[in-house]
Amino acid sequence: RALMPRFEHQRDHLEATIVDLEKWVAGGFGVPDFLDSLVLFRPDLHRVDGLENLVVFAMYTQNGNLDRNFEAVITRTVWPNWVADLEANKYDNPAFVPIEFVDFTAGYDTNSAVLFPETVATRELAKFHWGGIFCDREAARFRSITGAASELLKLAMPAELELMLADQRLTQETFVLWDLVHDRAHSHGDLPFDPFMIKQRMPFWMYALEELRCDLTAYRETVELEQNGVYLARFVRLAVLFD
């Protein structure tokens, strides 16, 4: 309630969250049900660069966590003009919401870089309208692991990769472009299967094929993007290879 004035565009959602919380408390903290508030959380309808959202749900976090946690996350939408133009004119994907962390509770102090509605505790499956990808965490993770791997292997890195490892902002924007093209590829082309029919992303080997297909699609697309003057395209190819 105290934070609501800061998130006026979320008022309906946050008011519903309070109701869901009060029901959960009244039921002795049994099985949580945040369906009513989840359906009102629509960051896909407010893709404005720099816009912050407050997310408070009982959820499973990613990376195989079997516990249902009560988490709070404040996100900031990453939607600069160049992303908006590419999404509108070439890679239409109304569910794509690139975000970065403003603050988070302990359950998100992990390597998880996604915020997906299917992880929220609900009495029934909600219709999905959005998927949040934390480009800042993707970039930081890439820089940390690639830097450590190159040092361990004594790998001479391309100059442009060294730029990425030294520049969080550059790498973050690179991942936004990669994610935009990759995510669009999930619903287009020759699918080995529909990945969103299987919420557990299983069997793992089959889902890995789908991820690889989308990454190779993104790699191929960057050739045309670079020819059309998209500066970040060359960095996406490096990110795909070294990731």
Question: What function would you assign to each model-found segment?
Answer:
Residues 207-223:
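An active-site-proximal "capping" alpha-helix that borders the catalytic cofactor pocket
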Residues 172, 219, 223-243:
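Long, well-structured alpha-helical subdomains associated
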Residues 190-212:
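Post-HEXXH active-site segment of zinc metalloproteases
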Residues 186, 190-194, 220-227:
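Conserved helix-loop functional segments at active or binding sites
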Residues 161-178:
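Short pre-active-site segment immediately N-terminal to the catalytic Zn-binding motif
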Residues 175-191:
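Active-site recognition of the HExxH zinc-binding catalytic motif
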Residues 9-162:
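Contiguous, non-catalytic segments that form substrate-binding/exosite surfaces or channel walls
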Residues 1-3:
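Noncatalytic N-terminal accessory/assembly modules of large enzymes
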